[in-house]
Each structure stands twice: as structure tokens, then as C-alpha cells.
A protein has these predicted regions:
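Conserved beta-strand-loop-beta-strand element in the redox core of flavoprotein oxidoreductases
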Residues: 305-325
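Active-site/ligand-binding neighborhood in enzyme catalytic cores
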Residues: 176-308
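N-terminal Rossmann-like FAD-binding beta1-loop-alpha1 element of flavoenzymes
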Residues: 39-65
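Dinucleotide-binding Rossmann-like beta1-alpha1 core, especially the glycine-rich loop
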Residues: 87-185
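N-terminal secretory signal peptides and thylakoid transit peptides that target proteins
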Residues: 1-19
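Active-site-proximal substrate-binding core of FAD-dependent oxidoreductases
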Residues: 545-587
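C-terminal segments that line or cap access tunnels to active or ligand-binding sites in enzymes
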Residues: 261-272, 299, 328-330, 335-504, ...
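Glycine-rich FAD pyrophosphate-binding loop
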Residues: 59-80
Length: 588
């Protein structure tokens, strides 16, 4: 069934027509089918991984059908309308699972963005990326730390003398609270990582918690908060005490080189210049349709049929409860791991042991809430890390980046001027208002608690940054259900405790016509990200092309930047690792 939206580019997306006659008889309808020459592909999932796979396959002449359980495409990356908020010809207020963050360390996703046509943009949707010029580390009970970002799209906001005074106080206050020897020690620990060979990283550091690697337990509270807890919980949604050093340090290394301008696609921080569906997802789906890709939305995969060692069909249920069997020559599973593994029955799992290992992969909550304000509130020209907030909140004021929009003119009822979009990464610690975890709160309590935590970090040193009088409404990700004694989240995030990497599968499976894509698949970036989803889809397509004996050009899969200057250190460390010795810089 095709579902269209009336006010956004979501009107471009939806499913194809169901086979109603067979469904009406209570049978299982046949969707899509095998093609002459083995060119038909069923992509199971319509998020970043699924759309990337469809993109690469369709450009190589395959007949692609995408099946998505939600009523919209784009997965967790999509934006969405806030129901009932558009008036006077304006679009509904824009909501989202969480704000977009597309750093310069990404290479594969930006390549895809360049290949999505967008009117007036010579580089397609890539030209819709905009770089913030600064960031803010909000400290509760102290002055905040405001930092410029090299390569931003504009100069940082003008500093008043008071701004400068507060920034200097915040910087030195934090610096002096982290003893100099601890800063030096952290740098030395990072050198251990930078000079470690791949074998040591994958087999040793993968199994060491970041907390232990950085010796956080014996360090100051600020060392723990800034360099250990904040880096892991606010960014990778994993507790420092259990987060894999391999995952955290891989990300940290990439950002260091990005900040130095080495091997990057662009500045260290980028976001989109409009709501995501407008700037990216809508144009993407439109382009894929032009290539012949078909979409079924509201169709959930229930089972995979295995015959003769190959997948013969995928059993799906549409939004009306009717069952369909999607037949194709090739199948690409592109669902999040918590949903994908429910579709692998005993026969499918028996065909490839790596599928069963996926049951050990863990997910957690990292979910967004948006606050709609009656006044423009550009706190800083960039993201804010509320590093002391109990719920590990990050935020950004969005209207300042949407250059093609006047917020009041284009969205809502004409009185809303800004959207403060927040991500909540910690749902299991008590807040400051009710003494309850986010999962124990009602939706209304979550909104009030997040607002209070924002103010606690921003309004705590004599300034009123967020005024209660300008708060009009809020929107919490509808995938989250709270109340009634049970909290659920239909769109969770893969997390990376120690020992995760060996349980992550490869894109190629032992079933010759079945391939995996998604941010849980083993990829170079390691962290569950849009970049990882995109790269995994490219890997899956390459495996499919190889299995099909195709002469089509293979997808480019770009790895993170690794400086040649460090290769000699890594080679020597490989020898030490094989001899059972520690890294030469690892002195305890």
C-alpha cells in the first residue's frame, strides 16, 4: 500500500500495490519475483543500508524492490511530521528520531550524497551539508567551554567581552581541574593505541573496556567525565566501564586526524541545511524511483524460506495483516539487527553459524526529543554536549542552519521560530526533577526532565539562555512507548561493549544468494553509524556481484584515514604482539 504525506517530501515515498485478490481469499500473495538472467533483488529494509544497496544495484541494472516495515523510508535517519501542527498552508513542524551528524571522517555516505540529484546543486545532496563554526561543552555549575571548529561554514558568533571572559574561565577551570599529569597520561595512552597493530587492536583492545584502558578508576572526576564517560556515553551510547577500547579509540583517532585536516571528506562537524527528508531522503527516493526501484512500505519481514540451500522467498505482512511472499534471485537483509535476527529461522541459522552469533549483539536507547520555541534561540552555531547531564544529552538549535527557510513562515502555525533538537543517550539513570530514570517517566515527564537538565547546564552561571516563556511544545520520537509499567523502543542503537566485534557478521553469508547490510555488520568504521550502514551495503552489493559473476564495476568502499607515518610503528608492534610482548609505549 502506498502511503503519501501531504506536506513534505515524504509524499514521494510509499509502497507498491498489494496483490489484493489473493489476499482477500486468505492466501499468501506473491510479491515481485525472479527475473530472467537472475537480475531481481529483494532488499529487506528501507533505511540507509537498504536505500544504499538499492542505489548501487539499480545503477548496475538490477531490478530492485525494497520492503520496509515502517510507513516511511529512511530508517532512523528520516525526519517526520509532528501530527496536527501545520496550519495556514504551512508544513507541519519537523520532528526526527535524532539530529543528523555527518562528520568529515565519513567517506562512503558523502559519496552517495554526491550521486543523488538535487535541483540547483552541482554536487547533489552533498551540497546540502553545512558545517557549524563552533561547539559548546555545557558544564553544570561552571562556565561552559565554547570552542571554534576549523573549516566551519562561517566565522564563530561574535564574542562579547562577557562571552570571552566566560569561555576563558570555563577552559581554565576545567583544565586546572584535570591535573597536568593526567592529561599527559591520557595522551600517552592514546599513543599506545595509535601505534598498535591491527592484530592487537582486534584481539586485545577489543576485549579491554575503555575505562580500564584509560585507567579512569584512579583518575580525577573531571578526567573521568571529560575523557572517559562523556566520550563514550554521549557519542557512542555505551558506558565507559564496558565500552570496547577498539571502538572508542577508532572513533577518537579518526576525529583527531579529521581535526588536523588529514584524509577527511570535509570539516569535523556537518549537518543538513533543511529537514532530513527535504535535504536528502526525499530526493534519494525520487532518484531511485527514476532508476526503476519499487517500494513497499508498511510491509514487515516475518520469515525467510530456505530451499535447496538458497533463499527462495521472504514472507512479509502488510499493514492490513495480509501475507505476501517476495520472490527474487537475490536477497539483501538491510534491517537493524534486533529486527533482522527475528527473521532468521532455525534452518537459516543452521546454514550459517555467524547468524546465531548476532543474538549476542546488544542494543540500547539513543533517542531524540525536539523542543519548539517561539523565539530564535541560536545558543551557539553548532552542537552542544551537555556533558554533566545525567541523561547524557546533546543538542543543536536548527533554524539557524536552514538557510532556505523562514521557520515561522514555513512551519507550524506561524508562531514557532526555532527547533532545539536533543538526543538522549542515557535512559537508565535518575534525573534531577523526579528522581526517576527516563524509562520510568511518562512522555510528559521526559520532556520536563530534559528541559530542566538543559537549563541546569546553560542557565547556571547568571545567564538565562533558555527561557520557559518561549517553550511552546515538544515532540518525542514515537518509536518510544512509555507508561503502563513497561518502556519499549522500536528503534534502538547497536552498542559496543567489549567482545562485540567477533559477533558481528560479514556482508557475505554461507547462503549464496543472501547478503547482510546494516550498521551491525563488520565495517572499518566499527561504530554503528549511517556511514557504517552505507559501507556495509556497498560490501553486500560487491559480494552479490561476485556471486552473480557480474562484470559490473564494484562499489568503492573507503576506509578511515590511516597515516603512513605510523605504519613503521605498527609493523614493529606486530612483531612484538606475535612474540607475546606489549606495545612499546605501554608502560602501565
Amino acid at each position: 500500500m502506498e502511503r503519501t504525506g501531504s506536506t513534505t517530501r515524504r509524499g514521494f515515498i510509499g509502497g507498491a500495490t498489494a496483490v489484493a485478490a489473493t489476499a482477500a481469499l486468505g492466501g499468501t500473495a506473491r510479491a515481485a519475483g525472479r527475473s530472467a538472467g537472475g537480475r531481481s533483488v529483494a532488499v529487506l529494509g528501507g533505511g540507509v543500508a537498504g536505500l544504499t544497496a538499492a542505489h548501487e544495484l539499480a545503477e548496475r541494472g538490477f531490478k530492485v524492490t525494497v520492503y520496509e516495515r515502517k510507513d516511511a523510508l529512511g530508517g532512523k535517519a528520516r525526519s517526520m511530521d509532528v501530527p496536527g501542527t501545520g496550519a495556514g498552508g504551512r508544513r507541519a513542524l519537523p520532528g526526527e528520531h535524532g539530529f543528523r551528524f555527518i562528520p568529515g571522517i565519513y567517506h562512503n555516505l558523502p559519496d552517495t550524497l554526491r550521486r543523488i540529484p538535487f535541483p540547483g546543486n552541482p554536487n547533489g545532496c552533498w551540497d546540502n551539508l553545512i558545517a557549524p563554526s563552533e561547539t559548546l561543552v555545557a558544564r553544570t555549575g561552571r562556565e561552559d567551554i565554547r570552542l571554534p571548529i576549523p573549516g566551519g561554514s562561517r566565522r564563530p558568533s561574535p564574542l562579547t567581552l562577557d562571552d570571552l571572559r566566560r569561555t576563558l574561565i570555563g577552559f581554565f577551570e576545567t583544565s586546572f581541574r584535570v591535573p597536568a599529569y593526567e592529561v599527559v597520561y591520557f595522551a600517552e595512552r592514546f599513543l599506545v593505541w595509535l601505534t598498535s597493530c591491527e592484530e592487537r587492536r582486534t584481539r586485545d583492545w577489543e576485549n579491554v573496556p575503555w575505562w580500564e584502558f584509560t585507567r579512569a578508576a584512579r583518575m580525577s572526576a573531571d578526567y573521568q567525565r571529560l575523557l572517559c564517560i562523556g566520550l563514550t556515553r554521549n557519542i557512542v551510547a555505551t558506558k565507559a566501564e564496558v565500552a570496547s577500547t577498539r571502538t572508542v579509540a577508532t572513533l577518537g583517532e579518526a576525529f583527531v586526524f579529521n581535526g588536523l585536516g588529514l584524509g577527511a571528506d570535509g570539516p569535523i562537524d556537518r549537518l543538513l541545511n533543511a529537514p532530513t527528508n527535504e535535504a536528502w531522503i526525499g530526493p534519494w527516493v525520487t532518484y531511485l524511483r527514476s532508476l526503476g526501484v519499487e517500494f513497499h512500505t508498511g510491509w514487515a519481514v516475518k520469515d525467510l524460506q530456505l530451499e535447496g540451500g538458497r533463499i527462495s522467498g521472504a514472507v512479509l505482512e502488510d499493514s492490513d495483516g495480509a501475507r505476501h511472499t517476495a520472490e527474487a534471485d537475490w536477497f539483501v537483509s538491510a534491517m537493524p539487527v534486533e529486527h533482522a535476527r527475528t527473521t532468521w529461522n532455525a534452518d537459516v541459522r543452521a546454514a550459517d553459524p555467524q547468524l546465531a552469533r548476532c543474538d549476542k549483539l546488544r542494543t540500547d536507547w539513543m533517542t531524540g526529543i525536539q523542543f519548539y520555541l517561539s523565539e530564535p534561540t541560536p545558543i551557539v552555531h553548532g552542537h552542544i554536549n551537555h556533558i554533566d547531564s545525567p541523561w547524557s544529552i546533546t543538542s543543536i538549535s536548527q533554524a539557524q542552519f536552514w538557510s532556505g527557510h523562514d521557520f515561522r513562515r514555513d512551519f507550524g502555525d506561524g508562531t514557532t521560530a526555532d527547533c532545539l533538537s536533543c538526543d538522549i543517550s542515557e535512559w537508565d539513570k535518575p534525573g534531577i526533577l523526579y528522581g526517576k530514570t527516563a524509562k520510568q517517566c511518562t512522555r510528559e515527564e521526559v520532556a520536563k526532565e530534559v528541559w530542566a537538565q538543559l537549563k541546569a547546564g546553560l542557565d547556571d552561571t547568571g545567564r538565562e539562555v533558555l527561557k520557559d516563556s518561549v517553550l511552546q511544545s515538544w515532540f518525542l520520537d514515537p518509536a518510544v512507548q512509555l507508561g503502563g509499567g513497561r518502556a519499549t523502543n522500536d528503534e534502538q542503537l547497536l552498542i559496543h561493549p567489549v567482545g562485540t566485534w567477533p559477533n558481528r557478521p560479514t556482508s557475505r553469508t554461507a547462503i549464496p544468494n543472501f547478503f547482510l547490510s546494516g550498521d551491525y555488520v563488520q565495517v572499518d568504521i566499527d561504530l554503528a553509524t549511517m556511514e557504517g550502514a552505507n559501507a556495509s551495503a556497498r560490501q553486500a552489493v560487491n559480494a552479490l556481484l561476485e556471486e552473480a559473476g557480474s562484470g559490473a564495476e564494484r562499489c568503492t568502499v573507503t576506509s578511515l584515514y590511516r597515516p603512513r607515518e605510523l605504519e613503521g610503528f605498527k609493523q614493529r608492534d606486530r612483531l612484538r604482539w606475535r612474540l607475546g610482548l606489549g606495545n612499546a609505549f605501554d608502560v602501565g
